[in-house]
């Protein structure tokens, strides 16, 4: 019977540690977003290189006046706009929803319900915003991957043979299918590796900060205990009064006769 409460206490302690680490991960999500922005920036740079290679098949004079090229360059230069929107729009929307809820008098009820679950409203807000950011960044990356695949197919279709001949050739179609499958495999492997690396760095940072916080709290408790010991000693010494001088009318007690004091 005693083993069941021990198991429950260990499970509750493990769940509490997991919740704390999740909260720390949410608080340190800026590092993950910076890593994703760096990845998107490198991805954009690679796309620029691919477009330059694709445009190298044609004379530069035609490329400069081509409307498709201008649209492509404009889209690449405006790539930072959806990234900024993906990072800022959810926070603005959430702030508007909270303002409307407070205006309608629903804010305190939501805050009380969230605090009953063991986490503050700020933590739940950060969790919601991080989920929205992750979804929007994933959608943006998916759009970029689709666009790059389309550009890759266009680059592969450009050559000496016409497009119809390429489509009718089975060898070319099989090679394109193999290249597509290889590309998707490399892309999925790279994405998983980068995500795992980002989560590993984030979790390591959270664990280090959690350990530092625990060490700081332990040091503060030890310092408080050491400061309390002299105060206790002073209190005990003040409670016991010092022996006063003898009264003036009192006489010293003489030893009785027959005692060893004679």
Swiss-Prot record:
Disordered as annotated region, ranges: 226-262
Keyword GTP-binding annotated: no
UniProt organism field: Bos taurus
Entry membrane topology: Multi-pass membrane protein
InterPro entries per the UniProt record, alphabetical: WBS28 (IPR029166)
Transmembrane keyword on record: yes
Principal location class: membrane
Residues passing through the membrane, by range: 6-26, 30-50, 67-87, 92-112, 127-147
Pro residues composition bias: residue spans: 240-262
Keywords carried by this UniProt record: Membrane, Transmembrane, Transmembrane helix
Taxonomic classification: Eukaryota, Metazoa, Chordata, Craniata, Vertebrata
Protein name: Transmembrane protein 270
Location relative to the cell: Membrane
